[in-house]
Amino acid sequence: MIRILGEGKGSKLLENLKEKLEEIVKKEIGDVHVNVILVSEDEIKELNQQFRGQDLPTDVLTFPLMEEDVYGEIYVCPLIVEENAREFNNTFEKELLEVVIHGILHLAGYDHEFEDRNSKEMFEKQKKYVEEVWGEWRSNPSEDSDPGKR
């Protein structure tokens, strides 16, 4: 199960994609609870400094908790996601989907920073899942698919 916490840009989109994201979690990790938390630039910068020693904001941070009620948390900064989308010539929606799937794969044990051996597999899976979910969502958007509401 996925809980979307925090409000603002991207929250409605994630709610609309929740079922598909839950399928990925179940396939990669199992029947666990994951929180996706939307945070400000200041909040993610503070977390990045505290846990990674990097004094700058980032788009996504993943924390495996492996507790009974919550397996892990994925912190996402919509503002940085939006900046990255512009930089990579991507839409905000697709970039948001990419970072959440990226976080799910980190919770599943994939690592691209310290383990080259599963980096390639991680990014291949990420691309596959993004294309599957994005393609399905684009061909069947919900009533709340107005970008201004996402």
UniProtKB/Swiss-Prot annotation:
Keywords: Cytoplasm, Endonuclease, Hydrolase, Metal-binding, Nuclease, Ribosome biogenesis, rRNA processing, Zinc. Its EC number is 3.1.-.-. Binds 1 zinc ion. Its main location: cytoplasm. It is found in: Cytoplasm. Zn(2+) binds at H102, H106, H112. One of its GO terms (cellular component) is cytoplasm. The keyword Membrane does not apply. Its cofactor is Zn(2+). Gene3D superfamilies: Metalloproteases ('zincins'), catalytic domain. It is an enzyme of class 3 (hydrolase). It holds the Pfam family YbeY. One of its GO terms (biological process) is rRNA processing. GO terms for molecular function: metalloendopeptidase activity; RNA endonuclease activity; zinc ion binding. Single strand-specific metallo-endoribonuclease involved in late-stage 70S ribosome quality control and in maturation of the 3' terminus of the 16S rRNA. Belongs to the endoribonuclease YbeY family. This is Endoribonuclease YbeY. It comes from Thermotoga sp. (strain RQ2). The gene is ybeY.
